[in-house]
Amino acid sequence: MTQANLSETLFKPRFKHPETSTLVRRFSHGAQLPVQSALDGKTIPHWYRMINRLMWIWRGIDPREILDVQARIVMSDAERTDDDLYDTVIGYRGGNWIYEWATQAMVWQQKACAEEDPQLSGRHWLHAATLYNIAAYPHLKGDDLAEQAQALSNRAYEEAAQRLPGTMRQMEFTVPGGAPITGFLHMPKGDGPFPTVLMCGGLDAMQTDYYSLYERYFAPRGIAMLTIDMPSVGFSSKWKLTQDSSLLHQHVLKALPNVPWVDHTRVAAFGFRFGANVAVRLAYLESPRLKVVACLGPVVHTLLSDFKCQQQVPEMYLDVLASRLGMHDASDEALRVELNRYSLKVQGLLGRRCPTPMLSGYWKNDPFSPEEDSRLITSSSADGKLLEIPFNPVYRNFDKGLQEITDWIEKRLC
């Protein structure tokens, strides 16, 4: 089936699909405070979703393209779930968030099909994959249209990988007690086996969102990157997130000695946001299999256990947490009780001495990850490094921070 036909089959013009903002039915905790964060973007009045311009631009999307799509959403006069929120248009039609971003992705998909230069075609496919992922954002469970956009993103990503430098292999990993999961192993030029970074992504992202990290930081140093989706989304959608948050990644780690392209004696874990919860758990539970762990903006304790911190977090992010935990109808109080169990300090891990070297990068006044969480990580490690990343200029400092983290990983891994 061609890409165009697949798009037409998946996105039939129906209007009974549930609208994203209605999927998690929590009791709202009142007026929202403005929130801005380097990794998560910022709350903007009249939008349900956080607008994550930095990460979208970092992944290769032109700022003007973001504004163009937003403008189409704003200008729509179609029926909305909440008339005060632009991105709540009901049904797959003009003005709907998923429709507009997927439509933009299809433009790049068509460019990719028409382009004769393999490298340029690969770039266009990657661009389309990124736009489809934004269409599916924030990847809530039960969002049928978002899941269709994710399927198109994965297909476009596979097309891109065939044309871009290096090699990518799609790999299946067996997990006892449930469905197997699929990951992508990205390998630089040269002969393996390669030192490898196991990516532990955020809860509002897909594994295909991290190609820029591999291409700009790991590949030039001869380091491979292995990604899997977090529990409950993408290729890991049949697995619910539990207090054993590192379960899937642990089984992947255990399988690496049987992967000929990976040097299983030189493996690092890198965690973004809640992915740091996974990475730090691995540092404690799988220290013989891991050389180092790096974290960025970690969610390991405060946000999970501090009611005041949770009150400052946008509704969308709390919806993401509730969705991942399978608590679509829970009260905020029930959600708070459950989240507390995910704190690595409450679990009795953080605070104990850990033999694995751990780095943690943070931004001051980050509403999702205070400095204390990063200090807790690095002070628990026998070889810890704390990295403060200045907020402004945000893009330049984000890049500089990633370069420093990669330097640190390379020094201990290679």
Swiss-Prot record:
It catalyses: a carboxylic ester + H2O = an alcohol + a carboxylate + H(+). Keywords: Hydrolase, Serine esterase. Its EC number is 3.1.1.1. It holds the Pfam family FrsA-like. One of its GO terms (molecular function) is carboxylesterase activity. SUPFAM superfamilies: alpha/beta-Hydrolases. Coiled coil: none annotated. Belongs to the FrsA family. Catalyzes the hydrolysis of esters. This is Esterase FrsA.
